[in-house]
């Protein structure tokens, strides 16, 4: 019974509020209320604006993923190089379609303390995943349990071709980008022990 009364009171209050007009005035044809527009919610407008902003940002960032590359052949060469240099292969999985992938690449390249840690410890590779080239065999071989991870995600391969770790980028995010401290800590923790 109390629910019915509460519902009726809420309904009547809502109807009364909706029927009120500011100062009792009727909107004139020149006021915004009188013009016919397609109703849009702020969320829809924000989504459209956000998509446009992301596309503009993508245009300014380098595109490190190569859809046409033979990823397994490239990884074989990088593993041999890493073994020779006493480094690991750091693989960033994603694609040029992924704003977070492009942001991470730019973040590492533009942050001297991160770039130094990477250059000293890793051979870096961008493993493409896209509609045109999903590199299914490579992902199945190195990261068979990564299906729940978002892009980018990372994995580290030692000089013998063994995957030492798979890392979600979600733990490294901060706002619209990444945390220098968290990313540096991740690189250091996954570097070869010297």
What kind of feature is each model-predicted range?
Residues 1-4:
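Positively charged n-region of N-terminal signal peptides that target proteins for export
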Residues 84-99:
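Short active-site neighborhood of thiol/selenol oxidoreductases, capturing the structured segment around
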């Amino acid at each position: 019974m109390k629910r019915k009364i509460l519902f009726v009171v809420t309904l009547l209050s809502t109807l009364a509020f909706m029927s009120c007009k500011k100062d009792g005035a009727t909107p004139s044809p020149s006021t915004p209320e009188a013009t016919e527009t397609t109703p849009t919610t702020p969320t829809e407008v924000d989504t459209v604006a956000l998509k446009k902003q992301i596309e503009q940002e993508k245009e300014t960032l380098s595109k490190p993923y190569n859809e046409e590359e033979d990823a397994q052949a490239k990884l074989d060469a990088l593993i041999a190089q890493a073994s020779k240099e006493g480094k690991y292969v750091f693989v960033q999985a994603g694609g040029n379609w992924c704003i977070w992938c492009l942001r991470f690449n730019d973040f590492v390249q533009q942050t001297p303390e991160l770039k130094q840690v990477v250059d000293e410890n890793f051979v870096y590779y961008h493993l493409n995943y896209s509609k045109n080239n999903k590199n299914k065999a490579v992902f199945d071989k190195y990261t068979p349990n990564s299906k729940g991870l978002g892009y980018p995600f990372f994995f580290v391969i030692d000089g013998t071709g063994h995957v030492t770790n798979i890392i979600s980028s979600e733990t490294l995010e901060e706002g619209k980008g990444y945390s220098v401290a968290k990313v540096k800590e991740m690189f250091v923790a996954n570097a070869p022990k010297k």
